[in-house]
Amino acid sequence: MCGGIRYEISEPLVGASYCHCTRCQRRSGNAASVSGRTTPGSLRIVQGEELLRSWSPEDGNPKVSCSRCGSQLWAEDRTQPGVYFVRLGTFDSDPGVRPSYHQFVDYAAVWEPLPDDGLPRYPERRPPTT
């Protein structure tokens, strides 16, 4: 990140995951993205709100990036207003959460094998938990 946008999260993230979908691969330039889920209303922009660039793909959650450097910052959960999936690589320090599963593994990049980390793997999006 260029540092133009600063944010804070007032409550601990409630979980994190690896996403291997082709959309995340193309947006990040990597084999997977790693995001943590916020609690409703816990994300606050501290600096650079004017630099936020938002767009909504047809088949996914609205995305937010920096208009200056292009860094992918977070996606908004369409089904739960105020809940965001924040890219863990955008934190200045330890985000305090570790990924607990892999999703969309049927689309995993063939050029980077899935790690043998013992985490659950889901062929598509992880089913909702009860």
Residue locations for each model-derived region?
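A short Gly-Trp-Pro
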Residues: 1-130
